[in-house]
Amino acid sequence: MSVKGITPQELAAYGIHNVSEIVYNPSYDLLFEEETKPTLEGYERGTLTTTGAIAVDTGIFTGRSPKDKYIVRDAITQDTVWWADQGKGKNDNKPLSQEIWNHLKGLVTEQLSGKRLFVVDTFCGANADTRLQVRFITEVAWQAHFVKNMFIRPSDEELARFEPDFIVMNGAKCTNPQWKEQGLNSENFVAFNLTERMQLIGGTWYGGEMKKGMFSMMNYLLPLKGIASMHCSANVGEKGDVAIFFGLSGTGKTTLSTDPKRKLIGDDEHGWDDDGVFNFEGGCYAKTIKLSEEAEPDIYHAIKRDALLENVVVLADGTVDFNDGSKTENTRVSYPIYHIDNIVKPVSKAGHATKVIFLTADAFGVLPPVSRLTANQTQYHFLSGFTAKLAGTERGVTEPTPTFSACFGAAFLSLHPTQYAEVLVKRMQAVGAQAYLVNTGWNGTGKRISIKDTRAIIDAILNGEIDKAETFTLPIFDLAVPMALPGVNPDILDPRDTYADKAQWQEKAEDLAKRFATNFDKYTDTPAGAALVSAGPKI
């Protein structure tokens, strides 16, 4: 079956004219040639490294630009989007008028017109019933490479009948000179129009804007259909038992979901529908700062031909210095998921989840290493999305910094957070799934809970041992904590026992409880949020 490709007339329908050539769904070999052409300049040019992967730079934008994110406010989105200018919660969903959208679209289409363009047709979502068919249009070869890595690659048969549901036009080279008069944040923009089903990118070269842009759109579309949309990793055991892992950066989400006894469904973005849990993506976007073969062999070995490195330091001989964070600490690599051996094949999906794990790294030394949550506590801790970091390594500086990120991914939520919590718990209740709060952080000893103990805790959750254990109730937080677990140091299960003076735990617990309550206040502007206050800590 022949792949139909795309015509200049189709691009003209988006406002792109006089295209000199269309490179449609290029192969990896062609992309390799295109992005290493000696005539390329600036951020377009890729560098071949000794790993076999190409390295590119994204300029001053080495991460997402949340302050430059906009959504057109119209009849469709007015009463559904969680707007930045409404309610108590802070978020990045700033409203944009149709008039300014038209102006931004004109800038991007003018930038892409008359050029040689790469068009990549992909799927977002591994379940054929609910996936988005996404068309990416860019003039930059490595950006086409990035989306080929990160999204699901259709077969020739699927491409022959491909009809896009969503268009992403990446005009990284263009900026908006009228931003001040229009009341925008800067000359750069990442804008969405849910009526036109389109994303526009201008001014930023960061590849992650395309990945997370479509995640934000799935986060809008799926929950409205009753499908959970989740910022999590997921894996499946030999018996088909599925576990999902939520957690902010530094909590161990990638490490703990990578398990030789279980197959990886995906590492970052998933949906949960009537058939089960499915990956949105066809690749992984892993951090590479201080990467080593010993610590993370799967990621290390995935960096080879067809992988794409971002903002790493490449030495004169082509070797990569993964320890050098001089460009950014957010160095990344994208690669197709099949670069990892132990994955679910041929489609990144599995059955319903039976275990839901919330990972937190509590630097306050208050939370137990593991607790079993009720349905309301599940919603409360999901909405809280808590973790904490130690403030610094200087002597005597021990005040932790708390982070609360709704649904463990506030930056990507398009609807009010309570809608995600409600859908998740409905999915869990339909199949009898159980949630657990796992603390990978610190306790009263001042040391971090060992990876050995944490892995044994995860094993006890996955094999069901934790559900047989006797529990006690931890005061203030009202959490059900096991009294003993196989392979876990019994002295750490009650966090109070890790303090020489238990009054210290009480004092810290009351402090942390107040922080939880202060954070949760923003959800009380909806009936669903107000009803969950009693599931939180009590002072």
UniProtKB/Swiss-Prot annotation:
It is found in: Cytoplasm. Binds 1 Mn(2+) ion per subunit. Its cofactor is Mn(2+). Pfam families: PEPCK_ATP. Its EC number is 4.1.1.49. It catalyses: oxaloacetate + ATP = phosphoenolpyruvate + ADP + CO2. Pathway: Carbohydrate biosynthesis; gluconeogenesis. Substrate binds at R64, Y206, K212, R332. GO terms for molecular function: ATP binding; metal ion binding; phosphoenolpyruvate carboxykinase (ATP) activity. Keywords: ATP-binding, Cytoplasm, Decarboxylase, Gluconeogenesis, Lyase, Manganese, Metal-binding, Nucleotide-binding. Belongs to the phosphoenolpyruvate carboxykinase (ATP) family. Involved in the gluconeogenesis. Catalyzes the conversion of oxaloacetate (OAA) to phosphoenolpyruvate (PEP) through direct phosphoryl transfer between the nucleoside triphosphate and OAA. This is Phosphoenolpyruvate carboxykinase (ATP). It comes from Yersinia pestis. The lineage of its organism: Bacteria, Pseudomonadati, Pseudomonadota, Gammaproteobacteria, Enterobacterales. The gene is pckA.
